[in-house]
Amino acid sequence: MSFRGGRGGGFRGGRGGSRPFTPSGPPDQVIELGLFMHDCEGEMVCQSTNVKIPYFNAPIYLENKSQIGKIDEVFGPMNQVYFTVKPSEGIVSSSFKVGDKVYLSGDKLIPLDRFLPKPKTVGPKKPKGARNGPAGRGGRGGFRGGRGGSRGGFGGNSRGGFGGGSRGGFGGGSRGGSRGGFRGGSRGGFRGRF
């Protein structure tokens, strides 16, 4: 899961998105964002320790508010977020040690619930039998055919089977045919009588 371009203008602009950062000095206060894990192709790979998601391109600092780079990418599952930092000029990613903390300004974070699906509103209940739509006309839960069609099967004349004529089989066989394998048994059964 990548958070780039999230809903409502993610990390690359758009309505409510991040604006281009202009050099304005360090923020009044920085908060911990995550821990350095390792470097990869000249960038810092870090694990987030914050419950919120950082903006793309947000400036990253040390605890003393000296800027070391900017967020390049955010990835991973919702409950274990990672991010990469593109170091500023003169900063070498391999010079950091595992567990070193990185910080950012608190106004460069997005609440996690912005990325979670909204709960569905409960609508009026559908009339009985409306779930299968016009395809189930006349049958008892069947997918096609009228009164003489299938009664729960996917095709043919089966009464609960997936195809063919058996009363509960996966395929083939009339009522008087073979009852072995997956074909026989009670209506809607899967095992049959051997």
From Swiss-Prot:
Record keyword Ion transport present: no
InterPro entries: Gar1/Naf1_Cbf5-bd_sf, H/ACA_rnp_Gar1/Naf1, Transl_B-barrel_sf
Biased composition (Gly residues): 1-17, 135-194
S-S pairs: none
GO CC, alphabetical: box H/ACA snoRNP complex; nucleolus; nucleus
The keyword Zinc belongs to this UniProt entry's keyword annotation: no
Domain of life where this protein originates: Eukaryota
Keywords: Nucleus, Repeat, Ribonucleoprotein, Ribosome biogenesis, RNA-binding, rRNA processing
Main location: nucleus
Region span, RGG-box 2: 137-194
A Pfam family matched in the record: Gar1
RGG-box 1, as annotated region: 4-17
An example Gene Ontology molecular-function term: box H/ACA snoRNA binding
GO BP: any one term: snoRNA guided rRNA pseudouridine synthesis
Region annotation Disordered: where it falls in the sequence: 1-25, 115-194
Compartments where found: Nucleus, Nucleolus
Described purpose of this protein according to its UniProt entry: Non-catalytic component of the H/ACA small nucleolar ribonucleoprotein (H/ACA snoRNP), which catalyzes pseudouridylation of rRNA and is required for ribosome biogenesis. This involves the isomerization of uridine such that the ribose is subsequently attached to C5, instead of the normal N1. Pseudouridine ('psi') residues may serve to stabilize the conformation of rRNAs. The H/ACA snoRNP complex also mediates pseudouridylation of other types of RNAs. The H/ACA snoRNP complex mediates pseudouridylation at position 93 in U2 snRNA.
Oligomeric form and interacting partners: Component of the small nucleolar ribonucleoprotein particles containing H/ACA-type snoRNAs (H/ACA snoRNPs).
Family matches, as PANTHER family: H_ACA RIBONUCLEOPROTEIN COMPLEX SUBUNIT 1 (PTHR23237:SF6), NUCLEOLAR PROTEIN FAMILY A MEMBER 1 SNORNP PROTEIN GAR1 (PTHR23237)
Stated family: Belongs to the GAR1 family.
Descriptive protein name: H/ACA ribonucleoprotein complex subunit gar1
Native species: Schizosaccharomyces pombe (strain 972 / ATCC 24843) (Fission yeast)
High-level lineage: Eukaryota, Fungi, Dikarya, Ascomycota, Taphrinomycotina
Gene: gar1
